[in-house]
Amino acid sequence: MHDKPDESVGRLIEEFLTARATRKPSPHTLAAYRRDLTTIAALVSEDETTPLPLDQLPITALSPRVMRTAFARFAAPRAAASVHRAWSTWNSFFTFLVAEGVVPGNPMPAVGRPRTPLPQPKPLRGEDTPEELLAAVARDDGRQRDPWPERDLAVLSLALCAGLRLSELLALRVASLAGRPGERRVDVAGKGGRPRTVPIESGVDRVLADYLDSRRRRFGARSVRPDSPLLVDRRGEPLRRGGLQYLVESCYRRAGIGDRVPRGARLHALRHTFATRLAEDGASAAEIMRLLGHASLASSQTYIEVTAGQQRAAVRSNRTNRALAVLVGGRGDDS
C-alpha cells in the first residue's frame, strides 16, 4: 500500500517494470513497456500548464480526459497495432496501481481502444522452399570464411520443425533438449512466461546431436554443459538477437530464396511455415495453440482460416472448374 496520493509517474513506472520483470519477459518486451509508458506520460506532461519531468508529474494528473487527449496525439502518426499495444500496457499499469492502492480506479476503459485485425501468417512462399533452404544450408559453402553448417542447420530446424520464436531460440540451454529416444522434446521458455514442451522428431534430434558434436570439436566438451546456451556464435559466445537475425538472413542468401521470404517476417517466416504446414496436415487450432505457445485460440485459428482460403483458391484455379464455369455461363445454383 502506498501512502502518498501524488506519487510521481516516473517512480511508479519503475515500480511497475520491476514487478513485471518477475514474470521473466524478454528484454525486448520490457523495453516496449517502458517506451509505451514514458512516451504517453511525456505527452501528458507537455499538456501541463508548466511541463514537468516524469519524476515530478503526479499520478493524479492522469485523469480519463487527460489520457484520452494524450492517446489521441499518440495515435495520430502511428499504426493501430502500436496504439493497441500501448493501450494494453497502460491498462496493465493502472491495474497494477489499483492493486497497490495508489489510485482508486483505472481510467483506461474511458480511453478508446483501437480494434486491430489479427496479423496474417507470413510463411515462406513456394511449396518446396523449406526443403530447398535446408538442403542448401546443409552443404558446406566454400564461400564462407568459417562455415559451420551444423550450427546453421540446427537453428533452421528448431524454427521450421518446432516453431520457436527468436527470443525462445536465444533462451534455450543444452539441457532444454530432453526425453528418451523416440520421445525427444525441447523445453521452451515461452512468451509471457508461458513454458511449453514441443516434441521433436528423429531428423531434428539428429541435426541437434550433430551440431553439439561439432561444437565439442570446436570448443571442447566443457562448451556443452547442461546449463550452457544451446546456440552460440563462431567464437563460442552465446548468440544474440542481431547475430541470430544475420545468421538466418545469410542462410536465405546462400539458398537463393530471398524473394520468397515475406517482407517484415525474416525469422518469423520459419515459425509461420511450421504452423501453416501443421494446419495443412489437419492439426486443430487447439493443437497449433499448444505447439506455438499462443496466448489465445484466435491467433492459432488464423492458420486454419488461411489454409482453408488457399485450398478454395486452388480449387477455383483448377482448369476443369474454369471450363465448367464457362460452360454454364457463370449461372448460380437455382435448385
Where are these regions (language model features)?
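Conserved catalytic core of the tyrosine transesterase superfamily
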Residues: M1-S335
